[in-house]
Amino acid sequence: MRLNSMAINLFTSESVSEGHPDKIADQISDAVLDEILKQDPKARVACETYVKTGMALVGGEITTSAWVDIENLTRQVIYDIGYSHSDMGFDAHSCAVLNAIGKQSPDINQGVDREDPLAQGAGDQGIMFGYATNETDVLMPAPITYAHRLMQRQAEVRKSGKLAWLRPDAKSQLTFAYENNQIIGIDAVVLSTQHAEEVKQKELIEGVMEEIIKPTLPSKWLNQHTKYFINPTGRFVIGGPMGDCGLTGRKIIVDTYGGAARHGGGAFSGKDPSKVDRSAAYAARYVAKSIVAAGLADRCEIQLSYAIGVADPTSIMVETFGTGKVSNDTLVKLIYQNFDLRPYGLIKMLDLIQPIYRETAAYGHFGREQFPWERTDKAEALRLAL
């Protein structure tokens, strides 16, 4: 790759597999949320999970009329991921499951609940960002999009038995080369995957290259200069919670835009939609994607902010990085006219009171068309409003 050109920039994003310890924790927290929402749409949930060798601790603040078998649900999530035998260092059948769940503070609750639902206040103060770019068909940055797809492919060939020596824990990292803000290729591919003890390094490298990397990454972006780092330490037998402890909410950049956009700092998993850390970040993505889909900008970043107990956002900011077809002020006016960004308004707009959250907890919350915040149904209205 012609990296001596002054116009060429490198940008890198990473992803992790569903078997990464932090992602195990995220999936357990969101599985608890989903089970509660099935029974109690008005529940208030803030569920945190910690996993380490031989144990999972589920805690947080939950106010609900629902009953959930936390122990069996936690074991089922761990089993579904693939930790089903003690040989892996973490076993759904034998690990301890500890329950440390309490109730939400009434001080918070009085600022959120209202007789008029549209007056529902934000569950906390905070800032949230949403982003979209037209460099991929899902209007997401390419590095994080394809890093996620590598991890999805790793899980697919692991669970199908095609590469039977694969284990659940894995990480990917992609460095893309850009010239004048256009992708010209992939400069580096990093993929580390947990594996069975008996597999040889040569077999592992060949298997990962042929079954994971080549079927996933577009060949037009790969060339003789692309560098590959497959299990560069040479050994990755001990992984999952035996290798590292895992905690809900510790992969916020993997969950969003891979560092290509700013982040407000709030994690998503385990939080019901009254928490604007989660729901307003989804709404900000919906707004940004709608603007790009409407052709009003090639790139768009939205910032929202809220005050606890207050319904209306305290600010809305638009940045189009010089790619806007209209002014940022015009876009802000269009947002106010077309999107209800009050907590209850955005929950209704995106139909967020439904059990869809466990699926978000691995492979990214954005760029996956099954989620309602990925719709572009308002793009035409934005175009016509000009």
From Swiss-Prot:
It catalyses: L-methionine + ATP + H2O = S-adenosyl-L-methionine + phosphate + diphosphate. Homotetramer; dimer of dimers. K(+) binds at E48. It is an enzyme of class 2 (transferase). InterPro entries: ADOMET_SYNTHASE_CS, S-AdoMet_synt_C, S-AdoMet_synt_central, S-AdoMet_synt_N, S-AdoMet_synthetase, S-AdoMet_synthetase_sfam. Its cofactor is Mg(2+); K(+). Pathway: Amino-acid biosynthesis; S-adenosyl-L-methionine biosynthesis; S-adenosyl-L-methionine from L-methionine: step 1/1. It is found in: Cytoplasm. NCBIfam families: metK. L-methionine binds at E61, Q104, D244, K275. The gene is metK. It comes from Haemophilus ducreyi (strain 35000HP / ATCC 700724). Mg(2+) binds at D22. Catalyzes the formation of S-adenosylmethionine (AdoMet) from methionine and ATP. The overall synthetic reaction is composed of two sequential steps, AdoMet formation and the subsequent tripolyphosphate hydrolysis which occurs prior to release of AdoMet from the enzyme. This is S-adenosylmethionine synthase. GO terms for cellular component: cytoplasm. Belongs to the AdoMet synthase family. Keywords: ATP-binding, Cytoplasm, Magnesium, Metal-binding, Nucleotide-binding, One-carbon metabolism, Potassium, Transferase. Binds 2 divalent ions per subunit. Binds 1 potassium ion per subunit. Its EC number is 2.5.1.6. It comes from the Bacteria. GO terms for molecular function: ATP binding; magnesium ion binding; methionine adenosyltransferase activity. Gene3D superfamilies: 3.30.300.10. Residues 104-114 are annotated as: Flexible loop. ATP binds at H20, D169, A170, K171, R235, F236, D244, R250, K251, A267, K271.
